[in-house]
A protein has these predicted regions:
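N-terminal beta-strand/beta-hairpin edge segment
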Residues: 2-128, 136-139
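Catalytic-site microenvironment of enzymes
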Residues: 131
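Outer-membrane beta-barrel proteins
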Residues: 140-144
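Solvent-exposed beta-strand/coil patches in large extracellular/periplasmic or lumenal scaffold regions
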Residues: 146-165
Length: 165
């Protein structure tokens, strides 16, 4: 199921600014669902192979077990870039977020100060991606705070890896 209250395109002739108001996606069979006040998909007309996704400060996620999650953030964006050739091969994808909080209808909560996740095609090696992650100040749910060597928070996580597909 996919529903929305409005779809609007603005910004032309310099940009394509697609705003989807009150999107609601759900799979009644599996029980998964997602909704938000809006989603924006943005691109420059002179660079349509680079698309930006802007997400709202609050989103709702429904899980198959009946649990409802609220994802809050002060900033949450993603972008994907393709090579500007007729085949549009993948170039890079980035997800950036700040002030993230995930709370559950079952009473748990976790937070994340910042996150940057990236994947980039390695042009010198076929079927190879370079992956990166920078995560700062992860606060885990109270139920996990007493796990040895974990504690109530992770101060930082950094990943720089190459993956051959």
């Amino acid at each position: 199921m996919a529903e929305t209250s409005d779809i609007n395109v603005a910004g032309f002739a310099d940009r394509f600014d697609l705003t989807i108001t009150e999107p609601h996606l759900a799979d009644p069979v599996s029980g998964w669902g997602w909704q938000a006040p809006f989603v924006q998909i943005l691109a420059m007309t002179w660079k349509p192979w680079h698309v930006i996704l802007a997400l709202p400060p609050n989103q709702e996620i429904h899980l198959p077990d009946g649990q409802d999650l609220t994802l809050s953030s002060t900033r949450l964006m993603a972008s994907v870039s393709m090579q500007p050739t007729p085949a549009l091969p993948f170039k890079r994808a980035v997800l950036e977020g700040e002030g993230l909080s995930l709370s559950s209808s079952q009473g748990w909560r976790m937070g994340l100060d910042k996150v940057v996740l990236a994947a980039q095609s390695v042009t010198t090696q076929a079927n190879t991606l370079r992956l990166g992650a920078d995560v700062g100040a992860l606060t885990v749910p109270q139920a996990y705070a007493n796990i040895p060597n974990l504690g109530p928070a992770l101060t930082a996580l950094h990943l720089d890896a190459s993956v051959i597909l």
